[in-house]
């Protein structure tokens, strides 16, 4: 049976003027004075927005993009990434390997993307891996 209203103790609430938005503090300063609670740092939201924007400016320097369109493209990239990673994981499991290599990624791209799009994606991916390999030597 729940306690009656008379039995409840009043909760210590923040003043009504306090907003729910986190206060702006210096990220480097963490103070734990007596009685003060530590502020939880805001979780970072990782997106592909900056990379999408850079590619847009390379292709169409005078064109902008709305926040909604950026959000849609970000969801699209996340979806394709997840599909390729899942397929590559399955391919590695079929071949009894515990490591996903560039070969599994390439095969999964060929399986997921249709026709000409897969060919272009594979060639761009191969070019990127070659460029990375030559720069690390």
Swiss-Prot record:
GO molecular function: DNA binding; protein heterodimerization activity; structural constituent of chromatin
Acetylation recorded as keyword: yes
Keyword field: Acetylation, Chromosome, DNA-binding, Isopeptide bond, Nucleosome core, Nucleus, Ubl conjugation
Skewed-composition ranges (Basic and acidic residues): 1-10
Positions bearing the Glycyl lysine isopeptide (Lys-Gly) (interchain with G-Cter in ubiquitin) cross-link: 131
SUPFAM superfamilies cross-referenced by the UniProt entry: Histone-fold
InterPro entries, per database record: Histone-fold, Histone_H2A/H2B/H3, Histone_H2B, HISTONE_H2B_site
Residues with PTM N6-acetyllysine: 8-9, 13, 24
Cellular localisation: Nucleus; Chromosome
Region annotation (Disordered) ranges: 1-45
Modification after translation: Monoubiquitinated to form H2BK123ub1. H2BK123ub1 gives a specific tag for epigenetic transcriptional activation and is also prerequisite for H3K4me and H3K79me formation. H2BK123ub1 also modulates the formation of double-strand breaks during meiosis and is a prerequisite for DNA-damage checkpoint activation. Acetylated by GCN5 to form H2BK11ac and H2BK16ac. H2BK16ac can also be formed by ESA1. Acetylation of N-terminal lysines and particularly formation of H2BK11acK16ac has a positive effect on transcription.
Cross-link (Glycyl lysine isopeptide (Lys-Gly) (interchain with G-Cter in SUMO)): 8-9, 24-25
Superkingdom classification of source: Eukaryota
GO CC entries: nucleosome; nucleus
Subunit structure of this chain's protein: The nucleosome is a histone octamer containing two molecules each of H2A, H2B, H3 and H4 assembled in one H3-H4 heterotetramer and two H2A-H2B heterodimers. The octamer wraps approximately 147 bp of DNA.
Role description: Core component of nucleosome. Nucleosomes wrap and compact DNA into chromatin, limiting DNA accessibility to the cellular machineries which require DNA as a template. Histones thereby play a central role in transcription regulation, DNA repair, DNA replication and chromosomal stability. DNA accessibility is regulated via a complex set of post-translational modifications of histones, also called histone code, and nucleosome remodeling.
Family listed: Belongs to the histone H2B family.
Name by which UniProt lists this protein: Histone H2B
């Amino acid at each position: 049976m729940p306690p009656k209203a008379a039995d409840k103790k009043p909760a210590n609430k923040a003043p009504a003027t306090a907003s729910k938005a986190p206060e702006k503090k210096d990220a480097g300063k963490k103070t734990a004075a007596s009685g003060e609670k530590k502020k939880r740092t805001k979780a970072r939201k990782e997106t592909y927005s900056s990379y999408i924007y850079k590619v847009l400016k390379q292709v169409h320097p005078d064109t902008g993009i709305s926040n909604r369109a950026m959000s849609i493209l970000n969801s699209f990239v996340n979806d394709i990434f997840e599909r390729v990673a899942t397929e590559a994981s399955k391919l590695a499991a079929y071949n009894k390997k515990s490591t996903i290599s560039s070969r599994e990624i390439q095969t999964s791209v060929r399986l997921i993307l249709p026709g000409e799009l897969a060919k272009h994606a594979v060639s761009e991916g191969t070019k990127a891996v070659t460029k990375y390999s030559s720069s690390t030597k």
